[in-house]
Amino acid sequence: MKSIIKGDSEDRCYICGCTEWIERHHIFNGTANRKKSEKYGLTVNLCHWCHNEPPHGVHYNQDADTRLKQIGQKAAMHEYGWTVDEFREVFGKNYL
């Protein structure tokens, strides 16, 4: 499914705007939540550096990862009309 995250673009990094080495990031990780991220459009495009390189890449930087999860939760709640409890039922945790 196409991303529901406002401002996401297929050809540039959601975080820094770079247009090189773009990779798709599933906002909610883990086997089950990765599939749910795909199903509900909770993905963003990131450059390789913002995605997978320490210390700033979201897979290494807790603050950046949490911020994307908060953005994803707000987007899902808006798009699907979910409450915090309904979001938690799907993804197992509240990030707000």
Region spans (language model):
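A generic structural signal for short, solvent-exposed coil/turn residues
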Residues: 5, 16-19
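Short functional micro-motifs and their immediate structural scaffolds
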Residues: 18-23, 52-55
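Polybasic, low-complexity binding patches
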Residues: 34-44, 52-96
